Amino acid sequence: MSSGWLTPGGYPAGIEQKILAGALDEGNRSGSRTRLLRFAPGVFTTAPFVHEYWEEVYLISGDLTVGNDAEGRGGENFPPGTYACRPPGAVHGPFKSNGGCLLYETHYYAG
């Protein structure tokens, strides 16, 4: 579990992913991917995300705040066990974690 973690493009240092299965081809809008995503304590993103694939997210452990401002303040807090399903085009984030967190995510194109 300690190897294979990389910071995804466009994410700040302290957020890392580990691809578990699959591959997502955003250019051809095909494929699927399963990954773990972890936030180090205190890390936050500064802008919302939007993409053209489905995303299902489960918060395994830690704390996650959604909707913070560019300085990491505010937002709505979510506990472990939280699940979200986002359709293509859904605006979501920014995100932060005060104590760090671990997420299980699936991304896929339907149809």
Provide a role label for each language-model segment.
Residues M1-G31:
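A short, N-terminal "cap"/entry segment at the start of jelly-roll beta-barrel domains
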Residues S3, R35, T46, E52-Y53, ...:
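Beta-strand-enriched cores of mature, soluble protein domains
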Residues Q17-I19, T34-R38, E56, Y83-C85:
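Conserved hydrophobic/aromatic beta-strand scaffold that supports enzyme active sites
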Residues F39, N68-A90, K96-S97:
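Short acidic-glycine-tyrosine-enriched beta hairpin
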Residues F39-P41, Y109-A110:
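Non-catalytic surface loops within mature trypsin-like serine protease
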Residues P41-T45, V50-A70:
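Glycine- and acidic-residue-biased ligand/ion/polar-headgroup-sensing regions
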Residues E56, C85-R86, N98-G111:
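A short hydrophobic beta-strand segment most commonly corresponding to one strand
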